[in-house]
Amino acid sequence: MVEALIPAPVELVWQRSQDPVLHVAWDIRFTRIAYLTGKDERGYHLMDYRTAVAFGVEVKGVGRYLHTTPLRHSTFEFDSSDWKSIIRDGRGIWLYEVRPGGTWFKTIYDYQHRRGVLGRLLDWLFFRRLLQLATEWSFETLRLWCAGDERAGARRRSRLRFLVFFAGRLLGLPPAPGAARSWLGRGRESQLEDQPAAVEVSRRR
């Protein structure tokens, strides 16, 4: 779970998180997001996700929006047939809530790994924590951008900056006051603590 209080109108946060081009500008987890033509058998729009890892290696995946209530929440699922991806499939939800200080933006997600016991070990030792903190880093980039820092996206695309942040968080350094924050699992959620059930609801749609 990752959340941030963004000092900006919900309309701006919605636009920059829902538009694929703007999404890539702040989310370090992806290098390309694009709508695909056509829909799946359930009528959901398909999206192509790409992540450049290193030395020309790219991981590919497909996303689907399951349900969207403008300016409030959107649920999605994702999967990858790319053998390089630890993630096999997963689901999540983005939540938007207007607060006195701006917009409370939150995501809850989970996924299934591939490669059996080896995948489970890699996920437990490294990947799940990496994905959690990459999401936290990205939410903080969005928060800074929406707060008026127009260079936040370009500055924070640096892998070196992220690795320094990642190492610091692994060593126990807390997020800066007011910055995006994250947790693994449930039990420490904040004011939107009743919302994790929304992910379960989306699975039954």
Protein language model regions, located:
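Hydrophobic ligand-binding cavity/cleft-lining segments
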Residues: 1-43, 157, 161-205
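Hydrophobic/aromatic beta-strand elements that line small-molecule binding cavities or substrate pockets
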Residues: 2-4, 33-36, 51, 60-67, ...
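A short, structured loop/turn motif at beta-sheet edges
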Residues: 7-11, 38-42, 66-73, 95-104, ...
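Hydrophobic pocket/interface hotspot
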Residues: 12-17, 23, 47, 65, ...
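A generic structural signal for short beta-strands and their flanking turns/coil linkers
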Residues: 29-31, 41-45, 59-63, 70-76, ...
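Short beta-strand segments that buttress and anchor functional surface loops
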Residues: 45-54, 76-83
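Beta-strand/loop substructures that line and gate deep hydrophobic ligand-binding cavities in soluble
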Residues: 79-136
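A conserved amphipathic terminal alpha-helix motif
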Residues: 111-179
